[in-house]
From Swiss-Prot:
Binding site for Mg(2+): D53, D92, E122
Species annotation: Paraburkholderia phymatum (strain DSM 17167 / CIP 108236 / LMG 21445 / STM815)
NCBIfam families: panB, PRK00311.1
Presence of the UniProt keyword tRNA-binding in the record: no
EC number from the UniProt entry: 2.1.2.11
Active-site positions on this chain: E189
GO CC terms in record: cytoplasm
Enzyme class: transferase
Protein task: Catalyzes the reversible reaction in which hydroxymethyl group from 5,10-methylenetetrahydrofolate is transferred onto alpha-ketoisovalerate to form ketopantoate.
Protein's name in the database: 3-methyl-2-oxobutanoate hydroxymethyltransferase
CDD domains xref list: KPHMT-like (cd06557)
Name of the gene this protein is made from: panB
Catalytic activity: 3-methyl-2-oxobutanoate + (6R)-5,10-methylene-5,6,7,8-tetrahydrofolate + H2O = 2-dehydropantoate + (6S)-5,6,7,8-tetrahydrofolate
Subcellular location: Cytoplasm
Known cofactor(s): Mg(2+)
Length: 271
């Protein structure tokens, strides 16, 4: 099928993301779970494809990401990788797969052998030794702080994080700890815009926001959300880019443009 052919643009690598941050070019990331969408998103200019454990929600109908398994992430990673996208492929480490550094490494190896070029895990200071262990063994790491969906029961629901002075201070410590341990990318979810801006200012590595304001180095959304495919109430940080567009490709291109020119997210999408 022609839509699975390689694109002509140069590969987006981990060093390329750092160069984009230093040049002030915004990074556009979307979740992706299969080869067809990987090819389409790559054609639209998306910089990074995240095989997120959000597949538990949007593909499997789960109420949380907790039931998603390593084998499932590996399967969808391989599907995305077969499209040979120029975009950087990042794969989530599911709940329970990185409790120890050794477990994290063994499971990260499986994802990278499936086609991941970077792995993402959720946590803060407590995760520093694991991140360091992975990076020392040539596993690029994207850390995820703020609202970490795998901690939904500990949080008592999907709630904005860092709203209190102590909570904000902890998120700053978590973010610095992840960078100091060697993480090369940081996702920040559902936190006050001012806090996310301060984290971005303090760190050297790129920050990717989802409900974290426009001052991050880039943005990520769940693909289904930005296409308007969400049951029930639309999350505050989501914009339906499919509205007014003639095709999915055009909608994704509109998302990329909005991220790059800083018009998304707007104040109505932030906390």
């Amino acid at each position: 099928m022609t839509y699975l052919q390689e694109t002509s643009r140069s590969a987006v690598t981990v060093p390329k993301l750092m160069a984009m941050r230093e040049a002030g070019e915004k990074i556009a990331m979307l979740t992706c779970y299969d080869a067809s969408f990987a090819a389409l998103l790559d054609r639209a200019g998306v910089d990074s494809l995240l095989i997120g454990d959000s597949l538990g929600n949007v593909l499997q109908g789960q109420s949380t990401t907790l039931p998603v398994t390593l084998d499932e992430i590996a399967y969808h990673t391989a599907c995305v990788a077969r499209a040979k996208p120029s975009a950087l492929i990042v794969s989530d480490m599911p709940f329970g797969t990185y409790g120890t550094p050794a477990d994290a490494y063994a499971n990260a190896v499986k994802l990278m052998q499936s086609g991941a070029q970077m792995i993402k895990l959720e946590g803060g200071e407590w995760l520093a030794d694991t991140v360091r262990f992975l990076v020392e063994r040539s596993v690029p790491v994207c850390a995820h702080v703020g609202l970490t969906p795998q901690s939904v029961h500990a949080f008592g629901g999907f709630k904005v994080q860092g709203k209190t002075e102590s909570g904000a201070a902890q998120l700053l410590r978590d973010s610095r700890a992840m960078q100091d341990a060697g993480a090369q990318l940081l996702v920040m979810e559902a936190m006050p815009t001012q806090l996310a801006a301060e984290v971005t200012k303090q760190l050297r590595i790129p920050t990717i926001g989802i409900g974290a304001g426009v001052d991050c180095s880039g943005q990520v959304l769940v693909l289904h959300d930005m296409l308007g495919i969400f049951p029930g109430k639309r999350p505050r940080f989501v914009k339906d880019f499919m509205q007014g567009q003639p095709s999915i490709l055009a909608a994704v291109e509109a998302y990329v443009r909005a991220v790059k020119d800083g018009t998304f997210p707007g104040p109505e999408h932030t906390f």
